[in-house]
């Protein structure tokens, strides 16, 4: 029987049979010149390549994005992108230097090899025609680098936005993935003065000095450390000669942040600072040259499921799970419009944006397997879902769905839920099988607070909790909010859903019972739950040895607070 995330043999066979094609495509595409805004040669290459592989419906949009759709008649779609531009110019000398399986060439990993992964994944889908819950869009897009301003993915999302249920950008390296995006705002700021001779007109305002003064003020801005907000002057120009009071000077300046509110605060500070410095002697202008938006609120469960799916698929391909990080990528655009999106790289390499850029070509085959598997798995993580918070369970349909979930999960608990008297039972010797123990347990939790997770309207996971809870085993934490039951449909486990439900419950508790401690208990052989609790910042505060049978302890946890030692 296949393990949950294992790479199926059909993916492996495809990649073995097409490895040489992938490497040859990589060589040819790497040596095809490209530049942001001048991607024409690579556009032509990808169009011809896809047609040769039988994807006759491949086309370009008005901007030049190369697009092939699988099952275009489907209303819902998942978008996959990889960018055709690099940071280098068309005149950059391109030569692949092969040292065994280490290949060196400008642009080979950012993002050429990921374009090849996109092409090969599209070829796999075209040839195997998998059954999926939605259509797929494969797009080799434009303008990702520098001041390209993400123009390619902007055009794609503008066109498909109402149909998109998720997106993945193929970019960067194998060791990390990026479910968090960094937004940026980039300006060309200029200062103009009357200027003059450095000796004869000494005392007049100097545009360079005034610009330096502005930089000093901008660098005094207090950023929000929690949102990873930064600023930078990247280039300064101006002046005429050593004996001239500069009439003009300009600089390129940017703010970056992962939080849109922080980025808006930066923009406001810049506008106010420049306005305060304007005078008859010094005129400032501020031109917006690039803007990459931050993420807005997106479905947290969908984001968690997509992230976990990518991590586990990549790990199954070659044994290493990528670490989650943050970056500015194609994903900025969908995330800014509430569309779940992740950025994933498939091959090992380094030296991005340098002439020493390198690729471990030995990682191409495993990367191809991961890419082919991921494009077929992610759509199942992108179904419409939502988190619902209630102060009790009254809806008949929800009750029926929760009962079904309890029945499925019953034997996963120690002791089974159907044998229990209540959610706060402490005498486990009194547990016994009942005629309809699930109905009794359901009735017990119906009056509790509940967080439901629904996929396409059906409850697939839930957590219940009590307020003002007291028991002798938690006497150090009186009137706590006590998490009683967490159930996740078996087919949906291991996808990050539990962590999101915990977060939603904690948010609900903080809003309704500020200052209350959060407590819970489980059993000592429930390793999966204990791993989640450790990850989410819960501390073990009491252990009752052999409380639920020989070798099975009852363990109590409390959510850590900042002042906890």
Q: What residues fall within each predicted segment?
A:
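Acidic/histidine-rich catalytic neighborhood of metal-dependent amide-processing enzymes
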Residues: 111-182, 254
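Metal-dependent amide/peptide-bond hydrolase catalytic core
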Residues: 1-10, 179, 200-384
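Conserved beta-strand-loop-alpha-helix junction that forms the acyl-donor binding cleft
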Residues: 493, 519-530, 547-549
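A non-catalytic alpha/beta surface segment that caps or lines the substrate-entry region
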Residues: 25-28, 34-76, 97
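Active-site metal-coordination/substrate-binding segment of hydrolases
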Residues: 75-137
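Acetyl-CoA-dependent GNAT
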Residues: 391-396, 400, 404-491, 508
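Conserved active-site alpha-helix within GNAT-family acetyltransferase domains
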Residues: 499, 524-543
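Conserved GNAT acetyl-CoA-binding A-motif
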Residues: 509-522
């Amino acid at each position: 029987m296949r393990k949950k995330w294992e790479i199926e043999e059909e993916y492996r066979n495809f990649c073995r049979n097409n490895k040489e094609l992938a490497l040859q495509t990589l060589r040819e595409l790497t040596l095809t010149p490209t530049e942001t805004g001048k991607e024409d040669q690579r556009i032509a290459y990808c169009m011809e390549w896809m047609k040769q592989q039988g994807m006759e419906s491949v086309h370009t949009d008005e901007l030049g994005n190369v697009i092939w759709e699988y099952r275009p008649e489907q209303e819902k779609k998942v978008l996959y992108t990889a960018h055709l531009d690099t940071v280098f110019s068309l005149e950059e000398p391109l030569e692949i230097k092969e040292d065994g399986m280490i290949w060196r060439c400008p642009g080979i990993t950012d993002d050429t090899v990921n374009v090849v992964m996109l092409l090969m994944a599209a070829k796999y889908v075209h040839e195997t025609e998998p059954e999926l819950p939605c259509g797929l869009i494969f797009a080799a897009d434009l303008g990702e680098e520098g001041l390209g301003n993400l123009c390619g993915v902007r055009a794609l999302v503008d066109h498909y936005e109402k149909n998109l249920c998720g997106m993945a950008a193929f970019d960067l390296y194998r060791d990390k993935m990026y479910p968090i995006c960094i937004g940026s705002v980039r300006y060309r700021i200029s200062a103009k003065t009357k200027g003059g001779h450095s000796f004869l007109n000494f005392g007049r305002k100097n545009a360079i000095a005034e610009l330096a003064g502005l930089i000093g003020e901008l660098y005094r801005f207090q950023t929000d450390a929690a949102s990873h907000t930064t600023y930078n002057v990247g280039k300064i120009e101006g002046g005429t000669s050593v004996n001239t009071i500069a009439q003009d000077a300009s600089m390129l300046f940017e703010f970056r942040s992962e939080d849109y509110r922080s980025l808006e605060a930066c923009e406001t500070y810049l506008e106010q600072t420049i306005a305060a410095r304007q005078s008859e002697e010094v005129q400032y202008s501020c031109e917006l040259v690039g803007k990459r938006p931050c993420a807005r609120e997106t479905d947290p469960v969908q984001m968690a499921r997509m992230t976990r799916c990518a991590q586990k698929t990549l790990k199954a391909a070659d044994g290493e799970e990528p670490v989650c990080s943050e970056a500015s990528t194609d994903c900025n655009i969908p995330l800014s419009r509430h569309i779940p999106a992740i950025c994933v790289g498939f091959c090992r390499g380094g030296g991005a944006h340098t002439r020493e850029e390198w690729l471990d070509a030995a990682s191409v085959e495993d990367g191809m397997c991961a890419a082919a598997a991921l494009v077929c798995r992610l759509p199942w993580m992108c179904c419409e879902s939502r988190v619902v918070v209630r102060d009790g369970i009254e809806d008949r349909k929800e009750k029926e769905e929760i009962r079904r979930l309890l029945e499925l999960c019953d034997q996963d608990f120690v002791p089974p839920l159907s044998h229990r008297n209540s959610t706060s039972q402490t005498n486990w010797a009194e547990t016994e099988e009942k005629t309809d123990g699930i109905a009794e347990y359901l009735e017990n939790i119906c009056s509790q607070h509940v967080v439901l997770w629904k996929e396409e309207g059906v409850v697939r996971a839930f957590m219940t909790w009590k307020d003002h809870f007291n028991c002798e085993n938690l006497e150090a934490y009186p009137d706590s909010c006590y998490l009683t039951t967490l159930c996740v449909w078996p087919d949906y486990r291991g996808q990050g859903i539990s962590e999101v439900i915990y977060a939603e419950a904690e948010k609900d508790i903080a809003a309704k019972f500020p200052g209350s401690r959060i407590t819970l208990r489980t059993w000592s052989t429930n390793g999966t739950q204990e791993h989640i609790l450790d990850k989410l910042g819960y501390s073990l505060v009491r252990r009752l040895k052999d409380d639920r049978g020989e070798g099975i302890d009852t363990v109590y946890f409390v959510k850590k607070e900042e002042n906890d030692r």
